[in-house]
Regions:
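General "foldedness" signal
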Residues: 18-20, 29, 33, 44, ...
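Charged interaction segments
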Residues: 51, 57-135
Length: 135
């Protein structure tokens, strides 16, 4: 599983386009469902094996519009991270991508180079993400 956040609201279709580009995966082999729909996604059992990505999206608050949980990807977390950053920068879709710094994320797609930011847990809450540029 790989999680990342999208800063501004975009549609499920746009999320699917973003993931197809980032994961080098056919558009029709990606299933994006909202967390509310996740209980019973409409897909035949034999189609599950053909998916190259299952994405569960949760609409959240604060500095972020979407929390995306990615499953069924045949790549390492490092590879996925690099691909998401590259497509975010190219398409200028602002994302928060977790990195190894304590509680740190890279804000990508909003400036020429990624910016190190940190989640402010004192202000954030369940399904609410707030970021700061300093610890």
């Amino acid at each position: 599983m790989f999680d990342f956040l999208i800063k501004y609201p975009i549609s499920i279709f746009e999320i699917k386009e973003f993931l197809a580009a980032a994961l080098n995966c056919p558009f029709d082999k990606i299933l994006v469902v909202s967390s509310e729909e996740n209980a019973d996604p409409e897909i035949a059992a034999e189609e599950w094996d053909k998916l190259c990505c299952l994405c569960i999206g949760t609409e959240v608050e604060g500095d972020v519009a979407w929390l995306l949980n990615l499953y069924r990807i045949e790549a390492t977390d490092d590879e996925i991270e690099k691909r998401i950053i590259a497509v975010s920068q190219t398409k200028q879709i602002a994302c928060y991508v977790p990195n190894d710094n304590w509680n740190g994320y890279l804000l990508t797609g909003s400036s020429p180079t990624p910016i190190q930011v940190y989640e402010d847990e004192e202000v954030a809450g369940e399904n609410k993400y707030i970021f700061t540029s300093a610890i």
